[in-house]
Design a protein with these regions (language model features):
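Select transmembrane alpha-helical segments in multipass membrane proteins
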Residues: 5-16, 41, 78-91, 120-124, ...
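Selective recognition of specific alpha-helical transmembrane segments in multi-pass small-molecule
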Residues: 53, 57-58, 150-161, 224-248, ...
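Transmembrane alpha-helical segments of multi-pass small-molecule transport proteins
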Residues: 11-14, 18-20, 48, 84-87, ...
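Hydrophobic, membrane-embedded alpha-helices of multi-pass small-molecule transporters
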Residues: 11-21, 90, 159-168, 175-243, ...
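TM-loop-TM module centered on a large, flexible mid-protein loop between adjacent transmembrane helices
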Residues: 69-76, 235-285, 301, 329, ...
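Transmembrane-helix boundary/entry motifs in multi-pass membrane transporters
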Residues: 2, 37, 65-93, 110-118, ...
């Protein structure tokens, strides 16, 4: 691999990291560290499996299917596969992750701007999402290019300064079971929804790699770049999980959706806390824009078969998003938890099956109990 290819590989790894790294995802390692305390290593082990390893394995599995979402899910059968794909993009879009992003934006800003009304804020956020999703806008890309590095830099600063100035008194978990903390981390990783996102990020990633001259070496390129992206994601999650453990005595009574803003204020001060809050807010906004646009595009092409235009679907999507945002972050998370606990194991099994069993002879044949038994 020459110098240019090495640079390309690193750049691609950073790009994949940026795609998976959402501002909202920082909430979950913080919440985990606050719960597991001195058992944080066990919690992290489970969390990293479902929040880091599985999304990148999902990306590799999708890569074997050339990013063809419908073909990937068709292993379950044509109708069940399309139904599951629709459920996944719905949870990522207006029925889950997108309104959760808006609710988190509101919660983070509320620490610096108390009394900010959720309904008015949600209407404004949905209006902005419509403007930026209605037609491709360079501002969205600019926000992504500028805010993602800024957010990562600020979060790294919080981690470093947080470790340097961490309080001497730490709490110990009242639950001595390592297994229960591992399981908590495993299920908390579901909340990042990154495995779900991997299926719909893959076509974007693969389209950027299409180069006939590199096809023979593409597998190694993607694997190395994925390892780079996964390693960066893991380091950030580990840092914030341990920060929440170290600062747990000062975070008592703070809701999960306000943990990031609260810890930023404690470590960097109130003024820096506002900067972090605004940065995270815009980062969440760009994530919500991408998710809603992906949902509307999927419904238009795969469900409605172009019979209904993009704009009406986008408007309906945002009306649903607004309605669910009013439930607030905690309630949205409580609704998503049981759904993710059912979906994730199925998607993990489907991912491994597609990763190790794809063949040109049976790509379109759905999984049967006999095939599944042979695979296991």
């Amino acid at each position: 691999m020459n110098t240019l290819k090495k640079f390309d590989c690193i750049a691609f790894g950073l790009a994949v990291f940026a795609m998976f790294f959402g501002a909202g995802n920082i909430i979950f390692p913080l919440a985990l560290g606050q719960i597991t305390l001195n058992k944080t290593p066990w919690g992290l082990l489970g969390f990293l499996l479902t929040a880091v390893a599985m999304p990148f394995i999902g990306l590799l599995a999708m890569f074997r299917y050339k990013g063809k979402i419908r073909l990937f899910f068709a292993r379950l059968g044509k109708i069940p596969g399309l139904s599951l794909a629709t459920l996944v993009i719905s949870l990522l879009g207006p029925f889950g992750a997108a309104p959760r992003c808006i609710a988190l934006m509101h919660s983070t800003l509320s620490l610096s701007f108390p009394g900010l009304p959720l309904i008015l804020f949600s209407i404004s956020a949905c209006g902005l999402i419509f403007l930026f999703s209605f037609k491709e806008n360079r501002l969205v890309k600019l926000l992504g290019y500028v805010l993602s590095p800024l957010m990562v830099a600020l979060l790294i600063l919080i981690i470093i300064k947080g470790f340097i100035s961490s309080p001497e008194t730490v709490l110990e978990s009242s639950n001595p079971s390592n297994g229960s903390h591992f399981w908590k981390g495993l299920t908390e990783g579901y909340n990042t929804m990154d495995l779900l996102a991997a299926f719909f990020f893959a076509p974007i990633v693969i389209s950027s790699l299409k180069n006939p001259e590199k096809d023979q070496n593409l597998n190694g390129f993607v694997i190395i770049a994925s390892i780079i992206g996964a390693s960066l994601l893991a380091l950030v999650y580990i840092g914030f999980c341990y920060l929440a453990y170290l600062y747990a005595p000062q975070l008592t009574g703070i809701a999960n959706d306000q943990l990031l803003g609260a810890i930023a204020i404690k470590i960097l001060g109130p003024h820096a806390g506002i900067i972090v809050g605004l940065t995270v807010t815009f980062a969440c906004l760009t994530t919500a824009i991408a998710l809603i646009a992906a949902f509307a595009s999927f419904i238009k092409k795969e469900i409605m078969k172009e019979r209904i235009g993009y704009t009406p679907i986008l408007i309906i999507s945002l009306l649903i998003t607004f309605a669910i945002t009013t439930l607030e972050f905690q309630r949205i998370s409580r609704i998503l938890n049981p759904l993710l606990e059912v979906c994730y194991p199925v998607l993990i099994l489907l991912t491994f099956y597609n990763l190790f069993k794809p063949s040109l002879n049976d790509e379109l044949q759905p999984i049967t109990l006999e095939k599944l038994n042979d695979f296991i």
